[in-house]
């Protein structure tokens, strides 16, 4: 674990996209808006993403790749980077979590943690 691991805060907002979902076909589309806040003293570049997505049936999908939404943003100190993406589940409920592979301005590699967050149809959970 690097001292830089805590320099990035990840905030998440999710939304069920009813118009593009098809419950009768077990296709539930969710969007998620991620805000990555650099609380550190140096710029940090997001190089990779690693997601683990689990639906209510326990089906696990792992997603790894370069950057996010086609970008590898450099986030200056005390600023934030925001993007929106999406995922399709076979069930109306699931969770996602993961990490971003980051590199600091000084070249140190570290992981930014994306804490588990819920994907759920509105009104499904009380």
From Swiss-Prot:
What InterPro entries has UniProt attached to this entry?
ApaG_domain, ApaG_sf, Uncharacterised_ApaG
ApaG domain: from which residue to which, for each copy?
2-126
Q: Cite the PROSITE patterns for this sequence.
A: APAG
Entry superkingdom: Bacteria
The Gene Ontology biological process annotation of the record reads: error-free translesion synthesis
NCBIfam families (alphabetical): PRK05461.1 (NF003967)
HAMAP family assigned: ApaG
What is the protein name given in its UniProt record?
Answer: Protein ApaG
Q: Which organism is it from?
A: Shewanella sp. (strain MR-7)
